[in-house]
Amino acid sequence: LAGGATINRFFNQEVIKAVWPIWLGYLPLGFAGGVLAQKVGLTPGETGLMSLLVFAGSGQFIALAMMGGGAASITSIVMTTFIVNLRHLLYSSTLASYLMEASKKYLGTFAQGITDETFAVNLNKFTEKESDWNADKALGVNVLAHACWIFSNVLGNIVGNVVSIDMAVVSYTLTAMFIGLWSFHFEHKLLIIVGVFSGFLALSLSSVLDHKLHIVVATLLAATVGCAAESWCIKK
């Protein structure tokens, strides 16, 4: 009974309800990642290990593409993946304010599961009015999302020889899912303005900044403008 109660803290109906939209996006994208890994020469076990250690869709796809090219060194792959995922620093620092009482062991486990989608879901749940969302439920979302990612990658690798996938369609799945996760924030005018500004800024910077640094820079600049605008509105 005690064990069941402990598990229920992390994996319950509320957590499942929060994470299922992520599953819908991760299944096709992870499957495509597994197919690509199979084409590069990775076994199902190696693909599963990579998905466990590199829980980042864009980072994993870029790493696989570089591995497939044959000319990239381990150092260049690691550094490129690190730069591409720098935005996770912003995500973790934002969520940290809701996890002030968590242990270092918890934070290490939680940080491994932060992605664009788990960040969006957890931040939305933490900021809901009269929310009872807590660190255990947030970790449950991360773990279940990560498990789905590993499963879909391994499955894609296993059947990679007999499946052909249109990567353009698959890549849009994640974009559509992320927009859906943030859709209920559209009632806040300032967030809409900042979001649109950030999008246009990212597009403008994409031609001059490599390795997706334009996303990090655009996010920081837009967030700064948003904070300044919010402070001005409050004072006014």
Predicted regions, residues:
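Alpha-helical transmembrane segments of multipass membrane proteins
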Residues: 31-35, 62, 121, 154, ...
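Membrane-embedded alpha-helical modules
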Residues: 133-217
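Helical membrane-embedded segments and adjacent short helical loop/helix-boundary regions
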Residues: 12-29, 42-56, 164-180, 184-191, ...
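Helix-loop-helix junctions within the multi-pass membrane cores of secondary transporters/permeases
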Residues: 7-8, 78-171
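Alpha-helical transmembrane segments and their membrane-interface exit regions
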Residues: 55-59, 83-90, 176-182, 202-204, ...
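C-terminal ends of transmembrane helices
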Residues: 90-98, 123-126, 180-187, 225-236
